[in-house]
């Protein structure tokens, strides 16, 4: 048979039937007739059903009407609830508006969003019906709110440092919050305690999260130094304090992870603040404390100290390259 020509298939098939024994042909013809009758019966049933359906469609469908009515009632009952945003002025609205503006800040939209933030701060300071104490409490709450956002975002650290630097020029509370934070920043590094994920996975995740926050804050501080919001000597003192903690930890057992994390922060200071430190190489604290500590750590070998990893040693070698360029 030629499968590529369906009509040839048809002719060949019936030629084949002609060659079948005559006793078989009547049986086939009989089956054809039965199929024909069956199809006619099926067609008649469909026709009768269509007529009945057409007839019944002329009658009012009370059940369908009732169902539609019930559905409309359900739709009315479960209409989506629309929550309207409150336009009432107050600290909650100002903080919400400020968060929105901070989230929208980009290099191109900086001025517009900065002005929106300043407008919210102005409303806070000029709000009527509250005393001076409450007004100061409100602005302090908002300032802390802004600081927490700005100091914990690694990707926008430079942009947020610019924002915070400008705010310190308009409201002294921002500088006060910054100085309070810096006074406790070094001691916060002592809170780094490694957690084994096999023992406490949730605790380990929090440990990683806190380390990321510390790194973001390190960048934020460095950019504030570049903007001269924080004096260079303040950052140099922070670096020395971190180095002292590292020197203590490498002599203790099971401090490898803590030393690694502190080293990462030190590297961020030196890498992002490279231009700053180029200008202060004559400073006594840099020349006789910071630089010798870096050189000493870079020359150690694994096993020289109880809690000194190859990772940390290599990172100090990278620091040598950074400050030597």
Where are these regions (language model features)?
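Long, low-complexity, intrinsically disordered regions
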Residues: 1-140, 171-197, 261-325
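Charged, surface-exposed interaction regions in soluble eukaryotic proteins
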Residues: 248, 253-257, 278-281
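Amphipathic alpha-helical interface segments within eukaryotic helical scaffold
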Residues: 147-150, 154-250
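Alpha-helix N-cap/helix-initiation sites
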Residues: 132-139, 153-157, 228, 232, ...
């Amino acid at each position: 048979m030629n499968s590529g020509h369906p009509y040839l298939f048809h002719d060949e098939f019936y030629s084949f039937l002609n060659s079948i024994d005559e006793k078989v042909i009547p049986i086939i013809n009989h089956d054809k007739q039965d199929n024909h009758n069956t199809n006619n019966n099926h067609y008649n049933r469909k026709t009768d059903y269509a007529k009945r359906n057409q007839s019944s469609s002329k009658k009012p469908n009370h059940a369908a009407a009732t169902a539609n009515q019930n559905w409309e009632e359900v739709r009315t009952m479960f209409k989506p609830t629309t929550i309207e945003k409150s336009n009432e002025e107050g600290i909650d609205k100002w903080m919400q508006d400020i968060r929105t503006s901070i989230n929208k800040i980009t290099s191109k939209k900086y001025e517009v969003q900065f002005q929106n933030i300043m407008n919210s701060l102005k409303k806070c300071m000029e709000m009527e019906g509250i005393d001076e104490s409450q007004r100061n409490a409100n602005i302090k709450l908002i300032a802390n709110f802004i600081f927490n956002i700005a100091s914990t975002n690694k990707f926008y650290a430079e942009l947020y440092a610019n924002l915070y630097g400008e705010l310190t020029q308009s409201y002294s509370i921002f500088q006060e919050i910054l100085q309070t934070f810096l006074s406790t920043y070094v001691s916060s590094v002592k809170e780094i305690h490694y957690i084994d994920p096999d023992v406490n996975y949730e605790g380990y995740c929090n440990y990683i999260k806190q380390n990321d926050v510390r790194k973001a804050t390190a960048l934020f501080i460095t950019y504030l130094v570049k903007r001269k919001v924080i004096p260079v000597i303040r950052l140099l003192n922070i670096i020395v304090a971190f180095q002292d903690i590292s020197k203590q930890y490498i002599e203790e057992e099971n401090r490898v992870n803590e030393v690694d994390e502190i080293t990462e922060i030190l590297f961020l200071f030196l890498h992002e603040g490279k231009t700053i430190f180029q200008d202060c190489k004559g400073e006594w604290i840099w020349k006789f404390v910071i630089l010798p500590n870096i050189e000493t750590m870079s020359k150690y070998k694994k096993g020289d100290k109880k809690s000194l990893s190859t990772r940390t040693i290599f990172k100090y070698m990278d620091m040598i390259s950074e400050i030597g360029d």
